[in-house]
């Protein structure tokens, strides 16, 4: 028996704040700073596909099945296909005439690496457009990455993020002395929420802080 690929259809949730972003194009979301992340989506459908079937074929199949099968709304533009092939999950945004492969749907992937070197299509909260991971460095045992804007016309300066996805600083000169100083200050400062959750996982405590109330 051939092993199958697993796929999940994520759909923008029914919250009032996300109403105007439903059924919009990828470009619209990027321009308006709507974060295409699990925070704004719920699971609409999940299933298995013949190995190697691919996202395009899954899209066709989803377009042909009964709309009532979806938990949130009929399948269509603004949905996300999460396809796991041989243990690796890729995410595709359903646009009108294409599928856009992008990164960063889950804040931190199960494998532990969220910001993958030389991968693009990441959105960064509070920053316009999409970003590519262009460099990485370790400071005091913590990983930081440099992100380059994928905007071709007048791109904004590069930025440095902590591996948790937290913003550290803008940089014109990559990991220079000034940037390293800011990374150290970041590590000394109050820890962002994400790190707070990671601490619990590291301690192996069942306690999941505030997050537990909001789990899908």
Predicted feature residues:
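Polar/charged alpha-helical tracts
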Residues: 28-32, 56-64, 178-188, 207
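Extended boundary segments
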Residues: 2-50
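Short, flexible beta-strand-to-coil junctions
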Residues: 2, 10-16, 81-88, 147-156, ...
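Charged, low-complexity intrinsically disordered segments
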Residues: 12-14, 53, 68-70, 77, ...
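Short, compact, well-ordered microdomains
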Residues: 74-106
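Short amphipathic beta-strand/extended segments with alternating polar/hydrophobic composition
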Residues: 20-34, 92-96, 160-161, 168-176, ...
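Short, conserved turn/kink motifs that form compact alpha/beta structural patches or helix kinks used as
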Residues: 37-83
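Extended intrinsically disordered terminal tails
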Residues: 105-216
